[in-house]
Design a protein with these regions (language model features):
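A structural signal for well-ordered alpha-helical segments within the folded catalytic domains
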Residues: 76, 152, 221, 281, ...
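Adenosyl-5′-phosphate
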Residues: 15-16, 64, 140-142, 146, ...
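Short loop/turn hinge sites at secondary-structure boundaries
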Residues: 86, 161, 316-318, 451-462
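Flexible, active-site-proximal loop/turn residues at the rims of small-molecule/cofactor binding pockets
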Residues: 347, 356, 477
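A mobile, often basic/glycine-rich helix-loop segment
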Residues: 351-377
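Cysteine-centered catalytic environments shared across enzyme families
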Residues: 1-315, 327, 393, 471-479, ...
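Conserved adenosine/adenylate-binding substructure
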Residues: 16, 29-30, 45-46, 94-101, ...
Length: 487
């Protein structure tokens, strides 16, 4: 259970509650920012993973209210904000986070996850205890978990490019806290889950007559705000630079914000069959233009297969992506230079750049029923009958739970067009970032607050092979010592 941060470790317990933490020092590198953090005056303890981008503003506001601080960390701001504003303190947070706050006197525990679910939080319950962790394998390491495959989760996994929507996971005995959710665990063991935020995809009438230039200006300003908010680390921050529009824009905005000598990183592979394996000529142009400290990382074919086990082991949940191993190797190399990097990923999720969005804009997708049909045809890996052909009778289900899930989501108010319904579903459910990089605590999603979601590369590594998802699931189960066939 060692992974997560490599810089420090801490344990705290009181009564029936215990917290453990491994730290990656990003803000306030001193021991004053260590976790679990206890504020004896307030009677609170916290253990969390993430970064609060507006913690300095909140710290000033809390200081004006009379609070005194013993550290310079965002962790302490989290504690005092909870003390001042209660559960709804999360409304004031801009950032990515998964936290557990314990009240000393009452024994109440509050768990919370950020709006877009950038930081994961898993739960497992038994008759006598509730355990939570930032990774699913951490719960498995503690034992006493029902590791049978959840048939409904398996149906989603085989329909949605290996995504299992919360609160389910692929295992029956483990759930995940949904994005923008709070879970209150009362002293008597009762639990209550509430959603504290939902994105609104309703078209704004006051922007109906905006020109393209108006939208360009608004997007650029929002990007500037997003980049500025993320410049809070007390360690050097780098940037992934592919040479494409998205990452090049981020590098330019970081330079505009005053970042000099920015470390940038580009990845390249061996050329195969006359096809060039890198785009260094494009990234070099941007690196030279903004005078970055540029690193070209070349990855040959030899380390790819040996790294497969490590990449799968780093996944909190089985995740099929054509670039998982590459990003795992990239994170190892980048971590030799910096602890945090920005990236330009996320634009396709905001501006509907994926291939399944154009059909959602057609007249046939205007109604909820039409939207479901178009989304199913463009996005689903296979229909329910196709899922049934892959699994054993023990996992066959009546009906179509994946189709029903999408139908119910599309039918909710707040998104009037097919594109908006798909964007809302993708932003809040379908899009998760690369698990291997996330496990290393390296990548900081460079996304517009409340708009951009984490990226998800979903191209199958075994094109044309109906068993690619099953194979990955089997490898993940074996890697985490879960016995029994997946299907």
């Amino acid at each position: 259970m060692t992974p997560r941060g490599p810089d420090a470790a801490g344990v705290w317990s009181q009564g029936r509650v215990a917290l453990g933490h491994r730290r990656l020092r990003i803000i306030d590198l001193s021991e004053a920012g260590a976790q679990p953090m206890v504020d004896s005056d307030l009677g609170l303890a916290v253990c969390w993973n993430g970064c609060i981008y507006n913690y300095k503003q909140l710290r000033r506001e809390l200081g004006e209210l009379g609070y005194r601080f013993f550290s310079h960390s965002d962790t302490e701001v989290l504690l005092k904000a909870y003390h001042q504003w209660g559960d709804r303190f999360v409304d004031r947070l801009y950032g990515m986070f998964a936290f557990a706050i314990v009240e000393r006197d009452s024994g109440r525990v509050l768990l919370g996850r950020d709006r877009l679910g950038i930081k994961p939080l898993y739960l497992t319950e038994s008759a006598s205890r509730i355990r939570f962790a930032s990774s699913l394998p951490a719960l498995l390491a503690g034992g006493d978990v029902d590791t049978r495959i959840d048939p409904v989760a398996l149906h989603h996994y085989l329909s949605f490019h290996s995504v299992v929507p919360p609160p389910r996971t692929i295992l029956r005995g483990v759930t995940k806290v949904p994005p923008a959710s709070l879970v209150a665990i009362e002293p008597d063991g009762r639990t209550t889950t509430t959603t504290y935020w939902e994105p609104d995809f309703t078209r704004r009438h006051d922007r109906a007559d905006w020109s393209e230039r108006d939208w360009e200006d608004a997007v650029l300003e929002a990007l500037r705000v997003a980049v500025d908010r993320r410049l809070v680390a007390d360690v050097p921050v780098g940037c992934l630079l592919s040479g494409g529009v998205d990452s090049s824009l981020i590098v330019g905005l970081l330079a505009e914000a005053g970042q000099h000598g920015l470390a940038t990183f580009s990845i390249g592979f061996e050329s195969v069959g006359g096809v060039k394996g890198d785009e260094f000529k494009y990234s070099d142009i941007i690196a030279e233009r903004f005078e970055t400290d540029h690193h070209q990382i070349r990855i040959g074919t030899d380390p790819m297969l040996p790294a497969l086990d490590g990449a799968i082991g780093a996944m909190s949940e089985p995740m099929v992506s054509h670039d998982c191993v590459a990003f795992y190797l990239l994170s190892q190399e980048v971590a030799k230079h910096v602890k945090v990097v920005q990236s330009g990923q996320g634009a396709d999720e905001v501006f509907a750049g994926y291939h399944w969005y154009p059909p959602m804009g057609e007249p046939a997708a205007a109604s909820v029923e039409g939207s479901v049909a178009s989304y199913r045809q463009a996005f689903f890996d296979r229909d329910s009958a196709g899922v049934g052909e892959l699994v054993t009778p023990a996992y066959l289900l009546d009906g179509d739970p994946s189709g029903q899930f999408v139908t119910e989501h599309f039918a909710r108010a707040g998104a009037a067009t097919g594109v908006d319904r798909a964007l809302r579903l993708d932003t809040t459910v379908m899009l998760v970032d690369d698990p291997a990089a996330k496990e290393r605590g390296l990548f900081r999603p460079e996304a517009l607050d409340r708009l951009l979601a984490d990226p998800n590369g979903r191209l199958t590594p075994l094109r044309g092979n109906e068993l690619w998802q099953i194979a990955l699931l089997e490898l993940w189960l074996q890697r985490h010592d879960i016995t029994g066939a997946a299907a």
